[in-house]
C-alpha cells in the first residue's frame, strides 16, 4: 500500500491534504476492524459516518469516534484491540502516547492516538475517541463504508441517521450559543429528509424528552431553544463560515428548514 499515492489521488478529487491523510488512517482502521473479527463489538459514529454517508470531500473529518459493544473499555482491553488491528492489517497500527480518560458531561470514554505506517514508512496519525454503547434500545445497523484501501468497501456497525440526528440536536440544545459544533447544523439539515420519522420520534423521546437533565419536553420547546440559538449574532456569523458550511445552501435556509422539520416530527 502506498499512502503517498493515495494522498495524491484524494487531493485530485477535492480533499485537502490533511483530510486525505486522515481518511487513509480511518479507512485502514475500518478495514482492520472487519479483518480482526471485532466487527460485532465496535460501532462507528460521528464524522466518519457522516463522511461515509455524504461521500463529500467537504465533509471529511480529521478524527474518529467509536463505541465498544459488549467489550471492556479498560486500557488493557484497548491495547489488545489495537494489537488485533495491527495483526490483521497490511499496515502497521500502533498506539502513540498515553491513553487518556475522557469526561465530558454525561460522556465517559478514552482517547488515544494511532500511528499508522505503510510499507514505505509513510506515517499518518489519527485521534480515536472510544466510548461504550450503553443504550441497548438504540439499534446499531450495518453500514457500508467505501474505503480507499479496498474497492469492495467494508460493512460495519454504525450509528443510524436517526441516532446521529438526535445526539447532535441534544448537544446543541444543551450548549446553546456556547456550542462550537456549527458543522452539526448542516449535518442535521442533510439528514432531515433522509430519516424514518417514526424512529426519530422515538429517539427524540429517549435522548431528550425523557432525560431529566433536559428542559425540552415537546417539539415546540425544542424550536424555542433553537430559535434562541439561531438568532444569536455570533452564532449566525460562525454558521456562515465556509469552514463549517459544507453544503451549498444558505445558513438561513438551513435553520428555517430545521425548525420546520422539528415541528413536523410528532
Question: Predicted regions: what is each one?
Answer:
Residues 1-42, 52-60, 64-266:
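Structured mid-to-C-terminal alpha-helical surface segments
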Amino acid at each position: 500500500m502506498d499512502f503517498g499515492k493515495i494522498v495524491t489521488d484524494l487531493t485530485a478529487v477535492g480533499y485537502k491534504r490533511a483530510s486525505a491523510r486522515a481518511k487513509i488512517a480511518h479507512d485502514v482502521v475500518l478495514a482492520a476492524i472487519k479483518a480482526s473479527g471485532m466487527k460485532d463489538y465496535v460501532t462507528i459514529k460521528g464524522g466518519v459516518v457522516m463522511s461515509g454517508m455524504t461521500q463529500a470531500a467537504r465533509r471529511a473529518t480529521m478524527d474518529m469516534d467509536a463505541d465498544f459493544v459488549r467489550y471492556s473499555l479498560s486500557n488493557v482491553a484497548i491495547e489488545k484491540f489495537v494489537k488485533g488491528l495491527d495483526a490483521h492489517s497490511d499496515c502497521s497500527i500502533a498506539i502513540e502516547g498515553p491513553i487518556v480518560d475522557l469526561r465530558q458531561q454525561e460522556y465517559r470514554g478514552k482517547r488515544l492516538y494511532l500511528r499508522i505506517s505503510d510499507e514505505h514508512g509513510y506515517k499518518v496519525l489519527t485521534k480515536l475517541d472510544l466510548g461504550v454503547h450503553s443504550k441497548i434500545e438504540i439499534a446499531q445497523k450495518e453500514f457500508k463504508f467505501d474505503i480507499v484501501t479496498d474497492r469492495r468497501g467494508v460493512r460495519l456497525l454504525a450509528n443510524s441517521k436517526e441516532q446521529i440526528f438526535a445526539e447532535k440536536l441534544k448537544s446543541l440544545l444543551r450548549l446553546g450559543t456556547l456550542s462550537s459544533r456549527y458543522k452539526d447544523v448542516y449535518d442535521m439539515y442533510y439528514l432531515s429528509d433522509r430519516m424514518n420519522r417514526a424512529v426519530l420520534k422515538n429517539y427524540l423521546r429517549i435522548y431528550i424528552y425523557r432525560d431529566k437533565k433536559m428542559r425540552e419536553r415537546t417539539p415546540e420547546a425544542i424550536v424555542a431553544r433553537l430559535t434562541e440559538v439561531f438568532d444569536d449574532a455570533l452564532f449566525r456569523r460562525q454558521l456562515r463560515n465556509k469552514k463549517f458550511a459544507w453544503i451549498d445552501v444558505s445558513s438561513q435556509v438551513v435553520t428555517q428548514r430545521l425548525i420546520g422539520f422539528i415541528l413536523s416530527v410528532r
